[in-house]
């Protein structure tokens, strides 16, 4: 390259430090890099942005793949990549996203902490419905464009804070996302282990090579159950995850303890699964005779004859062929009964969810010492950046206390957003203008994101 042209190009290249103010505003840290809350220096707008600095120098093929996908995907419920900055001097890569003040992991953690403090604040049913509908809408868009997310979990479901998009869900962390219309190799050959254990579909645990978009639907079912109960439905202790073998005895045992062992008539192709022989050797059907999703959800006061349970059952169908699709789920009767889903998931909600906290340079992210924690995700996890994931998934200890930024309680009122193409086919299920508040009153406990909770659930991290 001509030297003078190279010098000119370097001078014209936009530098992230010239455009954005972000010093002292770190909100996330991991082996994938650092995430900062940022604002424009020129005051062109007053929006908050998320700046992710990818760890290391240069850019990997996996990160290139994620960036290429995000540049093409445009949907209200999928995180928007605004810009990519490449620093020529130090070869650092910065990604600019919309900033989301909340995510489902912290929202669920808030409610779980309230239960632990003996003053439970239930997640409003209307909010659960709105969250689920928007997640399905975003995933339907991805699936319609031949994209599998493959790592859906509460930490990857962001929710926008105050602003024009308040209360809107944003599906984030596309580091594991893949096109599935015509892969050159079976997806299982490219990535033998995908999806965080607790949200991993049974066909993945049994070694399915040609898995489908049904794996995302199972994960959504797990998230739905967690929203209803404030507890991970298939929580289990973690083992060594460095192996590329997808088979996981304890995770299957947990699924069977909730769902029961699948009957041959309910999942005819289970005998074709690569790990079926191991399954038969390790498990006995009669061990789980008294286990069922009905019994599990009844303990959490979800009635088996309710539309809520019927949809959950369709999402958590063991046979991937029989599992409901995202489009079918959006048309389910559950979304046609009051309260109807809204564009602002916080509509009518008076619960003071805490904002994201700023981290100091010496302060770890809220998962504690990684060396003392069990690892939950495969060592191929990229955290959406193409670099090894933050293996900070604690099962043995809870998050350490951090410096808390005190935030005042907020009340919410939502507005109508434009209906997506997929909603137009089912106008009755489209977002509704929220009416007066019917949700639970604001808690006086003043919970923050450092509230104590059962440590076995402290396994997530901030994602973009």
Swiss-Prot record:
Region (Disordered): 361-464
Recorded GO CC terms: nucleus
Annotated residues for binding of ATP: 27-35, 52
Cofactor(s) named in the record: Mg(2+)
Pfam families associated with the record: Pkinase
Catalysed conversion reaction: L-seryl-[protein] + ATP = O-phospho-L-seryl-[protein] + ADP + H(+); L-threonyl-[protein] + ATP = O-phospho-L-threonyl-[protein] + ADP + H(+); [DNA-directed RNA polymerase] + ATP = phospho-[DNA-directed RNA polymerase] + ADP + H(+)
Domain of life: Eukaryota
Enzyme Commission numbers on file: 2.7.11.22, 2.7.11.23
Catalytic residues (positions): 151 (proton acceptor)
Family: Belongs to the protein kinase superfamily. CMGC Ser/Thr protein kinase family. CDC2/CDKX subfamily.
Record-given protein name: Cyclin-dependent kinase 8
Source organism of the structure: Xenopus tropicalis (Western clawed frog)
The gene coding this protein: cdk8
């Amino acid at each position: 390259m001509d030297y003078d042209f190279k010098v000119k190009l370097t001078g014209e290249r936009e530098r992230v430090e010239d455009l954005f103010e972000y010093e002292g505003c770190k909100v996330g840290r991991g082996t994938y890099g650092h995430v900062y809350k940022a604002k424009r220096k020129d005051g062109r707008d007053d929006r908050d942005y998320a700046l992710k600095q990818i760890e290391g120098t240069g850019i990997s093929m996996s990160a290139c793949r994620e960036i290429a996908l995000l540049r093409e995907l445009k949907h209200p419920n999928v995180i928007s990549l605004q810009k990519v900055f490449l620093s020529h001097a130090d070869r650092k890569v910065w990604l600019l996203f919309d900033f989301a003040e909340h995510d489902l992991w912290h929202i669920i953690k808030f409610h779980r902490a309230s239960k632990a403090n003996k003053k439970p604040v239930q997640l409003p049913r209307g909010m659960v419905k709105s969250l689920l509908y928007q997640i399905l809408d975003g995933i339907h868009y991805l699936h319609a464009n031949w994209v599998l997310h493959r790592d859906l979990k509460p930490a990857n479901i962001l929710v926008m804070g105050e602003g024009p998009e308040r209360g809107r869900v944003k599906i984030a962390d596309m580091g594991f996302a893949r096109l599935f219309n015509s892969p050159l190799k079976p997806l299982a050959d490219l990535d033998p282990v995908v999806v965080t254990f607790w949200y991993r579909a049974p066909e993945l645990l049994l070694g399915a090579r040609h898995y489908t978009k049904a794996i995302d639907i199972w994960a959504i079912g797990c998230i739905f159950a967690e929203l209803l109960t404030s507890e991970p439905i298939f929580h289990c202790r973690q083992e060594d995850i460095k192996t590329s073998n997808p088979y996981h005895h304890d995770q299957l045992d947990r699924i069977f303890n909730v769902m029961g062992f699948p009957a041959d008539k309910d999942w005819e192709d289970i005998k074709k699964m690569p790990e079926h022989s191991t399954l038969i050797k390790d498990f006995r059907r009669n061990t789980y005779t008294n286990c069922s999703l009905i019994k599990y959800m009844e303990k959490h006061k979800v009635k088996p004859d309710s539309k809520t349970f019927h949809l959950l059952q369709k999402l958590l169908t063991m046979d991937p062929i029989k599992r409901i699709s995202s489009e079918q789920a959006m048309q389910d009767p559950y979304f046609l009964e009051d309260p109807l889903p809204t564009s602002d998931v916080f509509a009518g909600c008076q619960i003071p969810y805490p904002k994201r906290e700023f981290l100091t340079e010496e302060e770890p992210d809220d998962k504690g010492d990684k060396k003392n924690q069990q690892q939950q995700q495969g060592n191929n996890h990229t955290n959406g950046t193409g670099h090894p994931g933050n293996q900070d998934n604690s099962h043995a200890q809870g998050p350490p206390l951090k410096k808390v930024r005190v935030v005042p309680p907020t009340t919410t009122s939502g507005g109508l957003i434009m209906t997506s193409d997929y909603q137009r086919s089912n106008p009755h299920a489209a977002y509704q203008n929220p009416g007066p508040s019917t949700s639970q009153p604001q808690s006086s406990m003043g919970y923050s994101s450092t509230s104590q909770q059962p440590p076995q659930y402290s396994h997530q991290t901030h994602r973009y």
